[in-house]
Amino acid sequence: MEEDTAVKTADLDPSEQEIEEEVEKASEQNRRFIRPREIVAFLLTTFGQKNLSQFVDANRQFFMISFLGISGKAYGLIVFLESIYDALDDSLSGLIIDRTRTRWGRLRPYMIITVPVWGIATLMLFTTPAMLSGQTQKIIWAVIAIFAYNLGMSYFNAWNILLYNITPSLKERDNLIATSKFFELIGVWIPSLVPIFVTFLPKITNGKVGMEGVYSGFGIGMAIIAAFTAVYGFFALRERVPLASREQMQEIGIIDSFKNAIKNRPMFVLIISGFFGGFKSVGASSESFFWLHNTGSLVNGTIAGLFTGLPNYIITPLTPKLIHKFGARNTAIGAGIFGGIAYTLLFVFTYQPFKIGTDNGTKYGIVNMVYMTLMLTICGLPNCVIRVCQAVLQGDVYDYSEWKYGVRNEALVATVTNYFGKLANSVTGLLSGVMITIVGYVAHTDALGNVVRETAPSVLNGFFAIFALMPAFARFMFGISLIFFNVHGKFKEDMLKDLEVKRLERVRKMQAESNDETIS
């Protein structure tokens, strides 16, 4: 075999042999580029940011309505307006990031220079200064905190694109995607302790530490963890995918770049699926209300979470095999439909099918808790599958953009994606606050500042409807939307082969131009 290869190579003239070597080098998908230290850094950054985002997303609305004292309508309007602003800001930040050139790379600097912005904003999100006496002052405080947090994250989230830049190997990239999504599961452990501390610490300390103080303490802790891991990631990670020069970037104007991005069909299908998938966050934002008021304790949510997340540790490592067998698109479609059916069944059977205790079953009971945990476990089975598939499909969008228009422009594609994503968030953010108002909930606290449990059946049924039906709608529409994602199957195989040829032609052209300059 080696002799045949040697004869074949000997028969080639020097130029053909050079091309053959280029092809062999370009096809070398088994080569390892990422060092172990970088894998650790990327996973730690993922861990830190997952901790922070999980904590903020799950508790911000509950804290601001229950302790800061703003209404659900005011909160929803703030999030709605901020999301519109954030969408416009992302358009600018994407262009700035795409054209950034520093000795530390294009993306890494934003991992460290944004830390003070979102770090301070996180502290503001979970504090209620005594100087805030009226509704107007409280709303202004909330506006500054929410706007500053999302502004910092608009630029910091450039680190997500590092996933597609720290290695040119598709195999390494896909493996890192699956590993990072698996590691994200660990990133929910610390935030999951919040309900336990909120429930028991005020009792243990005889009211010296109230519920509000627990949320504030966790906010500080999450900000410190996220900041430390981000700084470590900045120093440990490297960018390896070659960047286009400033001259090459200028060949395609900003307007043309936006036109190319807008005409990117798979990108828009992914945007639409993400828009519908975002409605699950409306249900997620009601979790604290549901567990406290419907079941009687926030701890119930933590107990359920200990079991509902366990299957993900098995399913996430298996997801690459599912993608290899069925394709990322088809796997995502199946996961979405499965999740929609599961959440619909959860709503049909209600959250307490077994009436226990007095007052029409207001005492939740162990049997109901076991049932709810089992149902939520089934509902959560496709979660990690969807997250892995989304990351893989995002890589397909970048590849399609390079194949179709000749320029990868990841930051620009991410900009357009984020633009529409933030517009979608404005809708779901508005719904999150408005839905709480629609069900008729008004927060009440006792003398120690702790939230008093709601008992009105109409309000409790409203909480559960948001909790179950919004995720059901989100999962169904997510799966259905991806039917129109065209980068899959034979088309994807042919596209990647053609893209490899185009890359080789680009390399040969650059080498030829370099040789001409050397001769002259």
Feature locations, PLM:
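Membrane-embedded alpha-helical bundles of multi-pass transporters/translocases
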Residues: T5-I519
